[in-house]
């Protein structure tokens, strides 16, 4: 279980309130698919993923990215119970979708990069440390149902 200090929680909540979920979600998933192309195999139904520009402009990538980041909002609301908050998604990704749990770590790291680019100087090392802790906790929670 991940333990967050009051300061870390405050830092995460403060920044999360400023995140444009639609924009950041689409960008995060798009970058994941570009930087780690083997992750594209889970998105065969998304159409054209042949180039970085095709991926970043793909409406299905943007829509699913928004969905992913919206569900990530559950982590922000449930920092003290990440495993519980992501139990159903963990089961889905393990039993039905067969997603390699390493991909959760990759997406979390891409999310941190997106936040850094969107918030610039506001994304201090302390802010990054809090967010890195959160995305790591989410990745662990999502991998929980894997055998």
UniProtKB/Swiss-Prot annotation:
* Annotated InterPro entries: Globin (IPR000971), Globin-like_sf (IPR009050), Globin/Proto (IPR012292), Hemoglobin_b (IPR002337), Hemoglobin_oxygen_transport (IPR050056)
GO CC annotation, single: hemoglobin complex
**Which GO MF term does the entry hold, naming one?**
oxygen binding
| Tissue occurrence | Red blood cells.
> Does the keyword section mention DNA damage?
no
Residues recorded with modification Phosphoserine: 14, 51
Keyword terms: Heme, Iron, Metal-binding, Oxygen transport, Phosphoprotein, Transport
**Residues in Globin domain copies:** 3-147
User: Alphabetically, which GO biological process terms does the record hold?
Assistant: hydrogen peroxide catabolic process
UniProt xrefs under PANTHER family: HEMOGLOBIN FAMILY MEMBER (PTHR11442), HEMOGLOBIN SUBUNIT EPSILON (PTHR11442:SF7)
Cite the record's note on assembly: Heterotetramer of two alpha chains and two epsilon chains in early embryonic hemoglobin Gower-2; two zeta chains and two epsilon chains in early embryonic hemoglobin Gower-1.
Q: Which family does it belong to?
A: Belongs to the globin family.
Summarizing the function annotation, the protein's role is:
The epsilon chain is a beta-type chain of early mammalian embryonic hemoglobin.
Listed name of the protein: Hemoglobin subunit epsilon
What organism does the UniProt record list as the source?
Answer: Cheirogaleus medius (Fat-tailed dwarf lemur)
Lineage, top ranks: Eukaryota, Metazoa, Chordata, Craniata, Vertebrata
Q: Which gene encodes it?
A: HBE1
């Amino acid at each position: 279980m991940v333990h967050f200090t009051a300061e870390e929680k405050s830092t995460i909540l403060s920044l999360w309130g400023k995140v444009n979920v639609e924009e950041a979600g689409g960008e995060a998933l798009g970058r994941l698919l570009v930087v780690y192309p083997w992750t594209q195999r889970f998105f065969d139904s998304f159409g054209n993923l042949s180039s970085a520009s095709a991926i970043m402009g793909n409406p299905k990538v943007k829509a699913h990215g928004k969905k992913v980041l919206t569900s990530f909002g559950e982590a922000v609301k449930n920092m003290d119970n990440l495993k519980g908050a992501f139990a159903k998604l963990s089961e889905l990704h393990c039993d039905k979708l067969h997603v390699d749990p390493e991909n959760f770590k990759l997406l979390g790291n891409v999310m941190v990069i997106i936040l850094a680019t969107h918030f610039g100087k506001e994304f201090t090392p302390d802010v990054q440390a809090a967010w890195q802790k959160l995305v790591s906790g989410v990745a662990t929670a999502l991998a929980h149902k894997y055998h």
